[in-house]
Amino acid sequence: MKTHIAWASACLLLVMLTGFFTIGQQTYKIEKLKDKNEVLSEKIKELNHIESTSSASENKAFFEAFFNYSDIDIRYETVKKHTTGKGFDYAFPSRSDQKHTVSVQSELLSLESYSKPLDESHELFLNIVEVATTANSVTTNQVLIVQTTMKKEKDGWLVDNVQVKGNG
């Protein structure tokens, strides 16, 4: 009888040790997966930030091209690189192909932008823009509130809509 109890105790001990090690392995695997998941989540956040930063930098590049110019005729070609066809039409609703005779220069003094992602391929920006414009040697400073909608295309982010919301 004592041998049966000893064998049963040994088997029970063996089952308990096996269960203990199995549970330990499962816990270890779960911890590794949690760590890996955390690393991947951080990478996703980084990539989203890079995408967001990319749209913000393209928004800034658009305003620099739009407001920093010394020749109106060259300005169109510079801005066209940062817009979709629709965005270009919104940026210059009354443009003409005639050469300009008036000397106009403009300089972007400051830009403050606030963004809101609309979906994966569109982001809305509200921009507070301070610009100095010189026409025939007379300089004026103006603060504008401009809304831009960025659209993600295969070439990157482009301005798809421009609306002046008011003067500051």
Swiss-Prot record:
Protein name from the UniProt record: Uncharacterized protein YddI
Subcellular location: Membrane
Main location as per UniProt: membrane
Cellular component annotations (GO), alphabetically ordered: membrane
Gene: yddI
Taxonomic source organism: Bacillus subtilis (strain 168)
Swiss-Prot/TrEMBL keywords: Membrane, Transmembrane, Transmembrane helix
Its membrane topology: Single-pass membrane protein
Residues annotated as transmembrane: 5-24
